[in-house]
């Protein structure tokens, strides 16, 4: 089998319609759902079947973590992303194939492309659910290569994905990464989706913890290291508001969607709902999927053309942050806004009051 460098192929609503429900779409979705199912009732510290691939992936992520220390961010009065992230990203990009070669001897360039895209965009200094999806695609490529089996799924989520999340939180805090295409208060999290999807499965069989438990700050903080859902809530609580003598603002104020979801009857309903929401808000959204890459392992659906310009050349997706636009304004990328982390840290520095940032 010959391997190729993945490229972006989804540029129009027509392309997107061919993607949704395609064999590759189903492969990606099925993999995510299988990963979710594997951690049903499992906490982050639950035992799982160890394997060489889990160990190799963990070592790979540790190398990424170590790169952050080589490129410390400098103090800045700006509330936007810190440019030192570009140095980190460049260093990672140059080393990615070397790192991946320790995991697989085939399709190194192809799998590396997804791995590199897992850490954000160096031009915009941002990160979002599309980058998170690339990390899943990186793992899926290894599955397609036979490096990963279903026996590894628990370890992939409980060890590898949680380690990836930990590094991403570090990157978000260190470089003040901006949220890519954030829905603001009407989203789950400025950056992530999958920890909610996996986390709901973790809690779906819990005998005592209810969805409304996310409003108990002490409980959330206590269990934030054990359950991904609570880690996300704890993270949001810490960055969305700055406590003062009046106390901090409620989840209802800065994250109304999460507040609404907490009214669900049980975690199993949330588990099911997260999959449905992921299909619509991530896999079914053009602003996200126009960044998705297809190669020999994750094949482009039939009927999606190779888009060319009037001279017959392939479209240059780098005209705007690595993708083409369906309109002339480029507002699919969202308005450039500071991250909640940047706003929160700036306010702490300025010793100001209790102000929410979305």
Curated annotation (Swiss-Prot):
Molecular function as annotated in GO: peptidyl-prolyl cis-trans isomerase activity; protein tyrosine phosphatase activator activity
Stored InterPro entries: Phstyr_phstse_ac, PTPA_C_lid, PTPA_sf
Principal localisation: cytoplasm
Source species: Candida albicans (strain SC5314 / ATCC MYA-2876)
Record's keyword terms, sorted: Cytoplasm, Isomerase, Rotamase
Subcellular location as annotated: Cytoplasm
EC number of the protein: 5.2.1.8
Catalysed transformations (reactions): [protein]-peptidylproline (omega=180) = [protein]-peptidylproline (omega=0)
A single BP term in Gene Ontology: response to osmotic stress
Protein name per its UniProtKB record: Serine/threonine-protein phosphatase 2A activator 2
UniProt keyword annotation of rRNA processing present: no
Similarity comment text for this entry: Belongs to the PTPA-type PPIase family.
A GO-annotated cellular component: nucleus
Source superkingdom: Eukaryota
Gene responsible for this protein: RRD2
Record function comment: PPIases accelerate the folding of proteins. It catalyzes the cis-trans isomerization of proline imidic peptide bonds in oligopeptides. Acts as a regulatory subunit for PP2A-like phosphatases modulating their activity or substrate specificity, probably by inducing a conformational change in the catalytic subunit, a direct target of the PPIase. Can reactivate inactive phosphatase PP2A-phosphatase methylesterase complexes (PP2Ai) in presence of ATP and Mg(2+) by dissociating the inactive form from the complex.
């Amino acid at each position: 089998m010959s391997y190729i460098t993945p490229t972006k192929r989804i540029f129009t609503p027509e392309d997107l319609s061919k993607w949704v429900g395609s064999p590759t779409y189903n492969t990606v979705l099925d993999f995510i759902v299988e990963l979710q199912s594997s951690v049903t009732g499992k906490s982050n510290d639950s035992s799982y079947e160890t394997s060489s691939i889990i160990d190799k992936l963990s070592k790979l992520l540790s190398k990424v973590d170590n790169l952050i220390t080589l490129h410390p961010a400098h103090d800045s009065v700006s509330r936007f992303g810190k440019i030192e992230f570009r140095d980190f990203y460049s260093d990672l990009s140059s080393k990615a194939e070397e790192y991946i070669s320790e995991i697989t001897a085939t399709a190194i360039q192809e799998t590396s492309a997804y791995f590199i895209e897992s850490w954000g965009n160096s031009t915009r200094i941002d990160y979002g659910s599309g980058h998170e999806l690339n990390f899943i695609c990186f793992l899926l490529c290894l599955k397609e290569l036979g490096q990963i089996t279903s026996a590894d799924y628990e370890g992939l989520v409980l060890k590898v994905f949680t380690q990836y999340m930990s590094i991403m939180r570090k990157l978000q805090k260190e470089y003040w990464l901006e949220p890519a295409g954030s829905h603001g208060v009407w989203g789950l999290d400025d950056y992530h989706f999958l920890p909610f999807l996996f986390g709901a499965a973790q809690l779906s069989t819990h005998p005592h913890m209810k969805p409304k438990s996310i409003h108990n700050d002490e409980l959330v903080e206590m269990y934030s290291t054990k359950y991904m859902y609570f880690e996300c809530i704890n993270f949001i609580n810490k960055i969305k508001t700055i406590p003062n003598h009046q106390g901090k603002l409620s989840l209802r104020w800065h994250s109304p969607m999460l507040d609404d979801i907490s009214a669900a009857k049980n975690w199993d309903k949330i588990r099911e709902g997260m999959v449905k929401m992921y299909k619509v808000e991530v896999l079914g959204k053009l602003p996200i999927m126009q960044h998705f890459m297809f190669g020999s392992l994750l094949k482009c659906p039939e009927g999606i053309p190779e888009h060319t310009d009037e001279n017959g050349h392939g479209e240059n997706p780098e005209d705007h942050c690595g993708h083409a636009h369906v309109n002339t304004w480029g507002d699919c990328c969202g308005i450039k806004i500071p991250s909640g982390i940047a706003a929160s840290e700036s306010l702490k520095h300025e010793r100001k009051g209790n102000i929410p940032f979305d």
